[in-house]
Amino acid sequence: MKIRYAAIFLALPLLCTTAQANSFLHYAGEFNFRTGEKQNNVTIAGLSAIIFDAKKNIFYAINDSRNNNKEGDASLYTLKIQVSSRGIEQVNFLNQRPLLDAKQQPFVTNTVDAEGLALTHNGKSLLWSSELGAPLRLSTLDGVMEKDFTSLFPARFNISSDKESSNGIRSGNAWEGLTVTPDGKSLFIAVESSLKQDGPIASPINSGTARLLQFSIDADGRPSKQLHEYLYITDPVPQVSKFGINDNGVSEVLALNDHQLLVIERSGRNVSAGFNDWDYSVRVYMVDLTAASDIKNIDSLQDWSNKSTLQPVSKKLLIDFADYTSSADCIEGVTFGPLIDGHTSLIFVSDNNFQPHQQTKFYLFIDKENKLKI
């Protein structure tokens, strides 16, 4: 997500979250890179998603550059992360490759803004979401696009919509979260915030809505058809900026199975005049789809006459980063990592937004009771 918003104050019912974070997760610390820092000639910036390939013991990451002079190349990274019960021992970036289109050329400027990343079940390709251009693409492990899946998305998302259109995704609030289920049979992709026809985005006085889509995946790891669509309610903006610029939305999802996911809500607030100096509040929720309504046939939540019959997904607070660190940055990626002494690990990564005052940060949690075991 690029930070370029003005605050919107419209009314939706408040969603009050009273659940406490779970104690079975042990926070094992963070590992940071300064903006501008390089490693093995790799520029470390703009990381918006990360995924672990357990068979190869490597991680893939992606950045959200729009292929412009300021942000550099839209890129795919491979890296090694050494973890132990003591924390993150080392992060080694192995290489950085440009994301290329089907003709093996760099994407045209402002037709790419990669936000989500998932490894196909066969380990041969990568799926990634984008806020610009095609919402979902399949690429080789070297970053060359094999196919885009725009045709799978319903017309209500108005993929090519401009800022003046009255329906569809909002600029900068589009396709943030992406995950493939552990069995490789389906994927989830999440819109960051409310569609234009669904109501207002989150503000300090109202919740927001986000749509979570589920697609089936064929034997080759390619999405084939939409299965379901669910309503996720984001929290109101938790902290208000005196400059009146703030937001809250979904920044990533991670599937535990076909009906339970982790969802990151990332809220930013401006701490000085302008648009480039932000602090963040980040919460992670355990989400269950079991009792949720399927809204794939509802084009507009605002116009739907039977709102009282709609059941959003359930959510329970798992992690509030404010409980563990005073400097949570713009966290946009999460993956399961290597086992640590037989325990599941979670690794989060932040997007420095190519800004000098931010950092690229990796955060490690260890599931001491293996409650998140997949």
What are these language model-derived features?
Residues M1-A7:
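Bacterial N-terminal signal peptides that target proteins for export
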Residues A7-L15:
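Bacterial N-terminal signal peptides
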